[in-house]
Amino acid sequence: MTESKEFLSYLLKGDRVACMDVVNQLLDATVSVEDIYEYVIRKSLYEVGDLWEAGKITVASEHLASSIAESVLNELYLKVLTDVKIEKKAVIGCVPNEYHQIGVRMVSDIFEKNGWTVFFLGANVPVSDFIDSGFR
């Protein structure tokens, strides 16, 4: 999907509006949210991580790209919501000392899209809080 390269380019330029334009064009072409998450957002963020690891971009650039990706997810979330509900629940979040929450956020969104009731706890959640979450 060449859109992932275009999306990545806009991420690295810090152009949130252009990133959202890429996503909206894909939605208009009836590309599924799941495919956008997998083949555009995930793929682009993996490349951002590789660039940072290789010293080709700064921490600030990586954080900006992540921030833009999260804002795109926030806009896409409204398209994920469904009236279909099933009798299943999930508590989703990152383990202690894990601050990279975009991947689990996408998983959470897809569970919701499939009718699950999801409690997304975000980054760096103590294990005891998962066990004791009370979201039963």
Where would I find each of the regions flagged by the language model?
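Conserved mid-sequence domains
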Residues: I86-R136
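Long amphipathic alpha-helical segments
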Residues: M1-V84
